[in-house]
């Protein structure tokens, strides 16, 4: 038998990762009365409607309830989407109000204002915090005890707000985080390398926004280090190509909005994926918005980090290895979000 000895550094790293591999109390599950085949969409704008359409096609749910401040809008979307049910699996898509959410397993919030050209980010934060303070107490009053998925931007800030005011265990309040950003990164890398994007493994972490971080140090193509794979493929400009791809991913939303005023299909697919891993209890690792509890020296702020997601929501936070530069950027990203929270008096 061949024995492998860990170096002192490796042993300390393993110990550190064991401490950081945070697991939530499995007893804190949704109540048995919760129907995980029933989902609620609060907000029927571009993102909400595209998501409901995607969920209708997925076959994940038997009931989809639409709620919007404009009841007629919710009714119109539910009617339009329902007419496609004969081409999908049988289910019920309907407009309703908060009294209908009591037994829902999943509530998705996409409601909120969009940032206007003359508005600061802090202006948007104040407006959408006000929206959340009007929505979440309605869920609490009706005893909602399922999983809350926050999509409204700035998603990391609003996930923090939702965790603070909902009364739900923090592992059952999930932000969509950088799930879409990570998909964009995988797509761009796949196009650059000429491989199926599903064979590319890499994460965007930190803020879902301008301070997001592409984790190049652990990026790989089917287990082959990304830089090595580029060399094998005849690419010899690794630093330049990764920088360009990271910028392209970060600016994707701006580029789309400039051309068609809004982004909604990609994020709809990202939300569908989050719902899928919850309903099917897949235990998949997704970079969702989670509360930091000392990992990487960061606490009391929500960041998008790889986490195991299943039927109970966020089941474990996965401490991926970061190099010094990536860890510094993650701390910078957390400080940016903390300042926004402080400026907004949260």
PLM region spans:
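Glycine-rich Rossmann-fold phosphate-binding loop(s) that bind the pyrophosphate
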Residues: 44-45
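C-terminal substrate-binding/catalytic lobe of Rossmann-fold NAD(P)-dependent dehydrogenases
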Residues: 166-172, 181-346
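A short, basic/flexible loop-to-alpha-helix module at the beginning of a structural domain
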Residues: 21-36
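Conserved N-terminal Rossmann-fold NAD(P) cofactor-binding segment
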Residues: 24, 63, 67-105, 119, ...
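Rossmann-like NAD(P)-binding element
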Residues: 86-147
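N-terminal Rossmann-fold NAD(P) dinucleotide-binding loop
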Residues: 48-49
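Aromatic pocket-lining residues of Rossmann-like dinucleotide-binding sites
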Residues: 55
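Rossmann-like NAD(P)(H) cofactor-binding subdomain of soluble oxidoreductases
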Residues: 120-186
């Amino acid at each position: 038998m061949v024995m492998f000895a860990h170096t002192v550094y490796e042993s300390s790293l393993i110990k550190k990762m064991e401490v950081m591999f945070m697991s939530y109390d499995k007893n804190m599950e949704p109540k048995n009365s919760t129907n995980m085949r029933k989902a609620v969409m609060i907000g029927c704008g571009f993102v909400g409607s595209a998501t409901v359409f995607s969920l209708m096609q997925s076959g994940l749910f038997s009931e989809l309830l639409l709620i919007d401040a404009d009841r007629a809008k919710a009714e119109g979307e539910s009617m339009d989407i329902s007419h496609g049910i004969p081409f999908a699996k049988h289910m019920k898509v309907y407009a309703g109000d908060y009294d209908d959410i009591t037994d829902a397993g999943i509530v998705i919030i996409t409601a909120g204002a969009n940032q206007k050209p003359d508005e600061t980010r802090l202006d948007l934060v104040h407006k959408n915090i006000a929206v959340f303070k009007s929505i979440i107490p309605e869920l609490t009053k009706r005893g909602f005890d399922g999983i809350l998925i926050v999509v409204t931007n700035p998603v990391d800030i609003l996930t923090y707000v939702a965790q603070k005011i909902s009364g739900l265990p923090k592992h059952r309040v999930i932000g969509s985080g950088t799930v879409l950003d990570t998909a964009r990164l995988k797509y761009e890398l796949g196009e650059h390398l000429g491989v199926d994007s599903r064979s590319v493994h890499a994460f965007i972490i930190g803020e879902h926004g301008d301070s997001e971080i592409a984790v190049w140090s652990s990026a790989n193509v089917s287990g082959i280090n990304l830089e090595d794979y580029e060399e094998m493929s005849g690419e010899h400009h690794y630093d330049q190509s990764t920088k360009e791809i990271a910028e392209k991913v970060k600016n994707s939303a701006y580029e789309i909005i400039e051309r068609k005023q809004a982004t909604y299909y990609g994020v709809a697919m990202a939300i569908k994926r989050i719902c899928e891993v919850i309903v099917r209890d897949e235990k998949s690792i997704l970079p969702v918005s989670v509360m930091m509890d000392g990992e990487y020296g960061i606490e009391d702020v929500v960041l998008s980090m790889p986490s195991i997601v299943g039927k109970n929501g966020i089941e474990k936070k996965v401490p991926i290895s970061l190099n010094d530069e990536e860890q510094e950027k993650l701390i910078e990203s957390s400080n940016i979000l903390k300042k926004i929270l402080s400026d907004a008096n949260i």
